[in-house]
Curated annotation (Swiss-Prot):
The lineage of its organism: Bacteria, Pseudomonadati, Pseudomonadota, Gammaproteobacteria, Vibrionales. It is an enzyme of class 2 (transferase). It comes from Vibrio vulnificus (strain YJ016). Substrate binds at residues 9, 44-45, 221. The keyword Transferase applies. ATP binds at residues 112, 144, 149, 182. NCBIfam families: PRK05756.1 (NF004398), pyridox_kin (TIGR00687). This is Pyridoxal kinase PdxY. Pathway: Cofactor metabolism; pyridoxal 5'-phosphate salvage; pyridoxal 5'-phosphate from pyridoxal: step 1/1. Keywords: ATP-binding, Kinase, Magnesium, Nucleotide-binding, Transferase. Pyridoxal kinase involved in the salvage pathway of pyridoxal 5'-phosphate (PLP). Catalyzes the phosphorylation of pyridoxal to PLP. One of its GO terms (biological process) is pyridoxal 5'-phosphate salvage.
Length: 290
């Protein structure tokens, strides 16, 4: 039985981390093997707080060892990683990706390098950002950063579309074959912007921006998951990006229309198979400097 190994956070209530990523990949036709870095009652934006615990790096390694014992790693089509709770967990992920690629050289590694955002800065524990930037992102086949995380990896500030394109080129030169910027903040506030960069070209995706009373948590995890599943279907990065962008819009639209804070992942599940709206991609290039 082939499948996707997804190593990220988990919430019992709502959709964030694995709770946002696992079902969409299953709905797109893939077996998913989730390993949780933390397990919380709910996401951490609730005023009432949350309960739960973080798992150790050894907990992750132990589960991977068990999967290896039954021959599962050679059937692993991709490793998808998101939020990591400690620097040691990052090292366990590095070891896991190495083991999976030894067992199946065709396996993809998709890294969502959760670090922070421009308005919040770096929000992760000490050592995590360094391990993401120096270990996990360079070894990934695909990275799915936001604008802040891309700027950290490319070691440059991003204020314009040209800056973003240059940053993506710098990122591609460090190892990854595909860069999907899941939120490009520096462009118009009137639209939500995402960017895809490969050696073949760079594409901008724009969709209407929703004015949520409280922004849903877990949309980035959803983007990474749908894109991973699209690539494993044999689609080109451009095709997977188009599908991912349209499907994510559909889920967010359903969430907005329902007046909900938590993503309406189950109610809008048809979006993962057949998105209801289509927003054509725009190929973009660096403006010629006179």
């Amino acid at each position: 039985m082939r499948g996707i190994l997804s190593i990220q956070s988990h919430v019992a209530y709502g959709h964030a981390g694995n709770s946002s990523a696992v079902f969409p990949m299953q709905r797109m036709g893939f077996e998913v093997w989730p390993i949780h870095t933390v397990q919380f009652s709910n996401h951490t934006q609730y005023q009432e707080g949350w309960t739960g615990r973080a798992f150790s790096a050894d907990d992750i390694s132990e589960l991977v060892r068990g999967l290896n014992n039954i021959g599962a790693l050679e059937k692993c089509q991709a490793v998808l990683t998101g939020y990591q709770g400690s620097a040691e967990q990052c090292l366990a992920v590095e070891e896991t990706v190495t083991k999976v690629k030894q067992a199946n050289p065709d396996a993809l590694y998709v890294c969502d390098p959760v670090m922070g955002a421009p308005d919040k800065g770096c929000i992760v524990a000490p050592g995590i950002a360094e391990n993401l930037l120096n270990r996990l992102m360079p070894m990934a086949d695909v990275i799915v950063p936001n604008q802040f995380e891309l700027s950290q990896f490319a070691e440059m500030e991003i204020h314009t579309l040209d800056d973003a394109i240059i940053a993506c080129q710098r990122a591609l030169a460090k190892g990854p074959k595909v860069v999907l910027v899941k939120h490009l903040y520096c462009l118009s506030d009137e639209s939500f912007n995402m960017l895809l960069a490969t050696q073949e070209g760079t594409y901008l995706a724009k969709r209407p921006h929703f004015e949520f009373a409280k922004a849903p948590v877990g949309a980035g995890d959803l983007i990474s998951a749908i894109f991973t599943a699209g690539l494993l279907k044999g689609w080109t990065p451009k095709q997977a990006f188009q599908h991912c962008h349209d499907a994510c819009y559909g889920v967010l639209n359903a969430t907005y229309q329902a007046g909900e804070w938590e993503l309406q992942t189950i109610a809008a599940q048809q979006e993962f198979v057949e998105p209801s709206k289509h927003f054509p991609l725009e190929e973009v290039t660096l403006k010629t400097v006179e």
